Each structure stands twice: as C-alpha cells, then as structure tokens.
C-alpha cells in the first residue's frame, strides 16, 4: 500500500520537484528520531517531538516553498540539518506526496 502511494505520487524521477523515493530515504535517516515519517505510522509515539509528516503535508496552504524555507532555517527545538539542495527538494517532494487526496 505504501509503495503504491509513493509510486502514484512520484511525478518524475529527479526534477526540480525532487524525488519522492529519495526523500523518503533521507527522511527515514535524518528525521524519524523526532517525526513520524511513514504514512502508515500515524499513531503517536512516546518520544515524538515534531509533527507527523502526514500532518505537515495536510496543513492548509502548505507549499513546497514553505517546506524548503523551514528546512533551511534554524529552529530552537530542532537540530540544525545539513541537507544538500537535492536532499531538501527530495524531502519536500516526499512530504507533499503524503497529502490526502480529497
């Protein structure tokens, strides 16, 4: 089910929009200590600090630009991420792929 959701939402392998599959891999490595990154894991974890990626994707008005700005800015409750521009594009594409399709 998860693979089908990713495949359905992946528009291009590597474009300005980023690569959904690569973004999922980066998110699992760099983000899952504090966030729920997988769509099927929506229940709260004991040590969850940040919002689930599914919830971020479904914030009204959330855009790729907003996610990119967030990922390149420092935040007191979040470790400073050192991601390449491609990784930022990939994570952004992955997060946006988790939007509910209404």
Language-model features, listed with the residues they occupy:
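C-terminal capping alpha-helices of c-type cytochrome domains
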Residues: 75, 82-102
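Bacterial N-terminal signal peptides
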Residues: 1-9
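Solvent-exposed, polar/charged alpha-helical surfaces in well-ordered, non-transmembrane soluble domains
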Residues: 21-25, 29, 65, 69, ...
């Amino acid at each position: 089910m998860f693979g089908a959701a990713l495949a359905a939402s992946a528009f291009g392998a590597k474009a300005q929009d980023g690569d959904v599959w690569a973004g999922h891999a980066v998110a699992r490595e760099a983000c899952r200590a504090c966030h729920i990154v997988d769509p099927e894991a929506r229940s709260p974890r004991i040590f969850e600090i940040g919002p689930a990626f599914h919830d971020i994707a479904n914030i009204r008005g959330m855009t790729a630009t907003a996610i990119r700005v967030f990922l390149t800015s420092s935040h007191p409750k979040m470790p400073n991420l050192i991601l390449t521009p491609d990784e930022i594009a990939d994570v952004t594409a992955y997060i946006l792929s988790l939007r509910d399709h209404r």
